[in-house]
């Protein structure tokens, strides 16, 4: 069916003889229409991409924020002496967790207090403070383990970093460090970690004053307010101008006024000379 081709009529596909000229014109028009449709489609895609790139979503993946450093104690394994330690509390918003970081012997230890752990610890401290105020903390009851409850946070430890992890049961109880000072105790026994290494058996001693400070760090209302403050700080866009500043009270404005006035006086003689 294909007739003899003319060299000048070869356009990448089989062009027919002049007797089939209408068919050839129809094919050319079809190709042109296809190119126009493809161009319009590509243009629309570019516009969509450009439009979508200007409306990026803002993540709430805020960086960790230090809440404070608590000066408290750890009790040695024989329970005969206490050592002062710094306990750093850090709020990690993306995972809604408060990190309690401290040194124990050679290890750097971190307790990851999720919301359930914070609630359990706060309730235990409230019971301790209530009995301390009522003076019902006796030596007889101090030997009872987990007197104020328990929780199971994630613990990581290591000499140079968080090389190991486990989920020990942290007990809340109290111990008389001296004859008249019953301290709130956070303690755990050693258990095998995820990689087979045993976690440290720690024993943290907090006074009533230090417990009150921990309550502030773990208060959910305070954490929510901090998160809102961080969001406002990161989302600040426009420069803030103090409406109370006026040319009379703003020293910079007064200085600029004098500078402009001096420039006008310099231009005066030149205009006269002209």
Swiss-Prot record:
Domain of life: Bacteria
Protein name per its UniProtKB record: Uncharacterized protein TP_0772
Region (Disordered): 235-274
Species the sequence originates in: Treponema pallidum (strain Nichols)
Positions with biased composition (Basic and acidic residues): 241-274
